[in-house]
Amino acid sequence: MAGFASANLLERVPEDEVLPAEFTVKAPPETDIWAKPPSTERFNAPILYKSIPLDTFKRARVAFSANWSQKYDQGGLIIVLNGNSGDRKWVKTGIEFTHDKPHLSTVAKDRWADWSLLPVPSGGTGATLEVVREPDDSLWIYLIQGVQKSPIREVTWVFAEEDVRDAWIGVYAARPSSAGGDLVVNFASLIIEVTDSTTK
């Protein structure tokens, strides 16, 4: 598996395959990953990722936190499917600040994006999430709390996509608001696992 690359990221990307146990991703204001009819398409948020063949993906996990303060502040894990024809589909899961507090948030974008929310456990500002390719080829998203693994979302279509050039697996941060300066998201213990058993 190749090393890390980035999109929309100003910081230097590690040249080898190893990230520090803890690292940050900084999102400037007016950055987002979103798609809503009739014509909203935004994909300018910083992403740190590894590029893999989609059919090799097994799972990804990360712990993360931030001082979420502006509406729609967000960060977490992301999977991007880059199509051979230039189209792009994606799934992102993390924490998003909305309705005056942080929520566990998952958005899946096929033609357009949907969005689901759950409370953050204990009303906190951090979480550990894992995305897994299950034996039935669904993508499942889990909240990890110690030894407890709680399912929070199933996305059925990801591994049924046929016209995929490559997949980006990694982390992202976004601050759609124009206020508040940069959003800094703290990440720890990122794991990216593929079928050849190569990990981070």
Curated annotation (Swiss-Prot):
SUPFAM superfamilies: Concanavalin A-like lectins/glucanases (SSF49899)
Entry keyword Transmembrane: no
Keywords assigned: Stress response
GO biological process: cellular response to osmotic stress
Induction text: Up-regulated when grown with elevated levels of potassium chloride.
Role noted for this protein: Involved in osmoadaptation.
Name used for this protein in its record: Uncharacterized protein AN7484
